[in-house]
Each structure stands twice: as structure tokens, then as C-alpha cells.
Amino acid sequence: MKMLRNGYLLSSIALIALVLLLQVTPALADKNPNPGVLPPNSHPFGKTYEEWNAEWWQWFFSVPASKNPALATNGALDCSVGQSGHVWFLAGSFLTSGSFTRSCTVPVGKALFIPLINSWADNVCNTPPLTVDQLRASAASGVYPPSNLHASVDGQAFTDLRSYRSRSPVFSYTLPPSPDNVIDAAFGVSLPGPCWPSLTVTPAVADGFYIMLTPLSAGSHSINFGGSGPGITLDVTYNLTVGS
């Protein structure tokens, strides 16, 4: 955000973004135990955490496997791939437990939506198809019960992370053609295929624990997050350079 030296006033564009970001009632703001993280019942940029949950998965599936951060182990990334708007997404790891350290650059003024642990479910290859309630139960089984949920920025740990659980609305997602998509990369399944007739999948639902970080100041920052769910344990560190 740009501040004018002669009055320390936010620019009009930044002010609008700030108003959209802070759509939290004063009572909620007063009770927020985690300064720098928007409360789970807030509406960052006019959307609920649940809606951002769905958007995270749509972004994740849309990113080619060759550039997908959730398939990366360690090292430098291009965090701009598939990103747009006021909110950028960070990623954990797709179907793989472990500790990962990554680095990338994020523009000033971007809020960050981060999954501590998360899971999704859809009806691909399900015969007969599951109901939405059954899909929700399937997604929940990947993250609940959680343990060791953790998140911190520059060593400042956040608390009460179980309260940041988010269950998405029903959504659709679209994959790039094979071989450069996450399903082909993870399972060796060429798409479209016999039980996956379309690159666009619906219905899908997701469950997980997410935090929405308010924009970080320019400079270097370290973000650590992760946790354990049934069958997966993650500890992820992003060394970020926040710049123009």
C-alpha cells in the first residue's frame, strides 16, 4: 500500500482494498486472538473463508504440474503462477507427508490464504456417485481429527487454529490436459480417461484448516505452517520476499 508523505494518507485504491479486507465487525476485531490473521467468520474481500477454500482448490487444480508448488519439495518457486487479485495462495503438499522449505517473491499488498492441512472429494470414478453429504464426509476424513496444527510468521505463533476449519460450498474445477496436471503427475492417469471423461469436474467439496494473512510489510518474512490429519503430516516453510 502506498502512503503519501505529506499526510500519511492511503491512496484511494489501497483504501478501497483495505476496506474490503477488513470487513470484520468491531466486536470480532476486538476478540481476534491472532493479529495479522483475519478471523474465520470474517469476509475477506467480500468472500467467506469457505468460499476462499473452494477458490484455493480451483487455483491448485488449474496450475500445471510442472509449476505447481504443492508438488515441489524444496527450493525457489514462482509464486505468481495462476495468481490474481488481492489474495494469493500458498500451498502445502499434494498427498505427501514431510517437511518442505520453499522461497519466492510476493508483491506488496497481497493477502495470503494458506492451508495448514486440507482435503477434497469428488465423484470421479465413483459408481454410483456419492451424494454431496457423502462427499463432505469423505473430505472431512482427510483432515479430521487434526493434531499439531501450527502457523507462524517471523516466529510469531498463532493460536486456536482448530477454529479456522473451513468446509467449502460445492464447486467445480478444471485441470490442464495430460501429462501436465497434478492428477497425472500423482497417479499416472492420463486425462481425459475412461472414468475421468472431462477435464472439468463437478461436484467437488473441500475441508480443511486455513488462515488468511493480512498483507505483509515489504522485506523478508518466514511463514511456517502445517499439521497432521489421518494419513498425512506436514511442516512447510516459505521464505518470502515481499516487494513490488
Predicted segment positions?
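Extended, well-structured beta-strand/loop surface patches
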Residues: S147-S220, G226-S244
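Bacterial N-terminal signal peptides that target proteins for export
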Residues: K2-I13
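Ordered hydrophobic segments in well-structured contexts
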Residues: N53, W57-W59, H86-A91, A111-I117, ...
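Sec/Tat signal peptide C-region and signal peptidase I cleavage site
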Residues: V24-A29
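Sequence contexts marking disulfide-bonded cysteines in secreted/extracellular proteins
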Residues: D78-S80, T105, V124, P194-W196
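Extracellular-facing segments of soluble proteins and assemblies that are Gly/Ser/Thr-biased and enriched
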Residues: H86-A185
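N-terminal segment immediately downstream of the Sec signal-peptide cleavage site
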Residues: D30-H86, G227, I232-S244
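Bacterial N-terminal signal peptides
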Residues: S12-Q23
